[in-house]
Structure formats: structure tokens, C-alpha cells
Regions:
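Detector for outer-membrane/organellar transmembrane beta-barrel domains
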Residues: 39-167
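Aromatic- and glycine-enriched pocket-lining scaffold segments that form the walls
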Residues: 1-62
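C-terminal closing repeat unit and adjoining cap/tail of repeat-based domains
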Residues: 173-198, 211
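Residue-level signature of outer-membrane beta-barrel architecture
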Residues: 35-37, 80-83, 135-137, 179-181, ...
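Alpha-helix capping and helix-loop boundary segments enriched in small/acidic/polar residues
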Residues: 20-21, 67, 210
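Hydrophobic, lipid-facing positions within transmembrane beta-strands of outer-membrane proteins
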Residues: 27-31, 73-77, 127-131, 171-175, ...
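A glycine-biased, small/acidic residue-tolerant capping/turn segment at secondary-structure junctions
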Residues: 154-156, 196-206, 210
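Outer-membrane beta-barrel "beta-signal"
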Residues: 181, 212-226
Length: 226
């Protein structure tokens, strides 16, 4: 599939913007394969995004045209099992600069041409995985667990553009119970999310000197479906 950004945008020197992919003239490319057998689905995919963060730079009050590009690859595997009473789904992503998908990450500046101000970049990589398990028909208990780890960059960087680039790891767990009858769904859900924040290690783009912040959330729902 060839994809263009509209509502969900990549991060860059000017925050979230469509101009990075517009100036790149290269759409996002995704290729995947799925295997299905009865209630089981297993698949994998690869995604490429190529962005142009800037087209000009200013050095000593002079404006220079620059040719910048950052291209990154991301990989994912996924599975889903569905039976009369069971639903099990899981996914794991090795991501690189996936801010347009609401993921944490981005890219950093690895070098600057002192004459023209042209910059070269190194993408931030992270690993994220989640699993969701649901059982039952009328009464449905369910659990969800997700984890994300910042893997840093391949090169030394001086500055980062992205989302949550000061987060080292993120952990989220959810337990819920729903009561399901025709046209109605009643439920309660508890979620605990913890994030470990810190400072950028410029030598590898990782986050160091971390401390954790946790959030507790309790949600009750009543849905009428027609």
C-alpha cells in the first residue's frame, strides 16, 4: 500500500506537519502478508517512511537551499485468535520514526554542514508489544498488557525532533469486566500506566537518569447499541 499523510502527521523541526512528506514526494510504503486458518490469523509487515525535514537553512543571515532526507524502516508481526468464547490478539513492532502513527519516537540531528546549515539525521528506534485476552460470551473478563522501550539511535545526536523522546520505557496494564446482552453492554475497566522519563544521552539517543510517573484510571461504561 502507498499512503499519504492527512490527519496523522510526522513530527519535525516545525512540529507536526504535512510538509515533510509533501517536500519528500515519496509516500509511505507498507507491505504485509497474512495467513488465515479458521479462527487464527498470523501476519507480518514492513513499512518505509521517507521525509524531507527542511528545504532551506539560514547561516549568518544567508539562506541556503538544502537537500535533506531521512528514510527509515519499521517491522511488525501480529496475530489474532477468535473462537466462540476466546479472543486473543497480539502485536509487536520494531519501529523507527513512527510519530505519524501516534507512536513515541522521532529522529535526531547527527551532523550539520557549517557552511550551508544542511543537517543529516538519525532515526530513533523503539520496540513496542501488546497482548489482549478476552473470554466469555455474556460475562467477559479481559486483560491487556503493553510495553514500549526506547532503543535510541545508531549515531550520536545533538538534538531530537519527535514525540516523547525523553521517555525511556512505557508500561500499561488493563483489567476489565463487561456484561453483554442484546443491545446492551455494561462494563468496568481499571488501567495502570507508568512512564519512565529522563535525559537524552547524546552519544546514542537513549534516555538516562530516569524516574517513573504512574497514572491510575477507572472507567465505567454503559452502551446501548441499535
Amino acid at each position: 500500500a502507498a499512503l499519504w499523510q492527512s490527519q496523522y502527521l510526522s513530527q519535525g523541526p516545525e512540529g507536526k506537519s504535512q510538509k515533510y512528506i509533501k517536500n519528500s514526494c515519496v509516500p509511505e510504503i507498507y507491505a504485509g502478508i497474512d495467513y488465515k486458518h479458521k479462527g487464527l490469523l498470523i501476519g507480518a509487515g514492513i513499512e518505509m517512511v521517507s521525509l524531507t525535514p527542511r528545504t532551506q537553512a539560514t547561516v549568518e543571515d544567508k539562506i541556503y537551499k538544502v537537500s535533506e532526507r531521512i528514510t527509515s524502516l519499521s517491522y511488525e508481526v501480529h496475530m489474532k485468535y477468535n473462537s466462540e468464547k476466546w479472543l486473543v490478539a497480539a502485536k509487536s513492532v520494531l519501529g523507527s520514526n513512527l510519530t505519524q502513527t501516534s507512536m513515541l519516537g522521532g529522529y535526531g540531528i547527527k551532523s550539520i554542514d557549517p557552511r550551508t546549515g544542511e543537517q543529516e539525521y538519525s532515526p530513533n528506534r523503539n520496540s513496542s508489544s501488546w497482548i489482549n485476552i478476552v473470554y466469555g460470551k455474556t460475562w467477559k473478563p479481559a486483560i491487556f498488557f503493553g510495553y514500549m522501550k526506547n532503543l535510541g539511535t545508531s549515531d550520536a545526536v545533538t538534538n531530537m525532533y519527535g514525540t516523547g523522546t525523553n521517555v525511556d520505557q512505557l508500561l500499561s496494564g488493563t483489567a476489565e469486566l463487561t456484561y453483554n446482552v442484546p443491545h446492551w453492554k455494561l462494563g468496568v475497566e481499571y488501567n495502570l500506566t507508568s512512564a519512565w522519563y529522563g535525559s537524552l544521552n547524546h552519544s546514542n539517543g537513549k534516555v538516562v537518569d530516569t524516574h517513573s510517573v504512574s497514572n491510575n484510571r477507572l472507567v465505567a461504561t454503559a452502551l446501548f447499541m441499535f
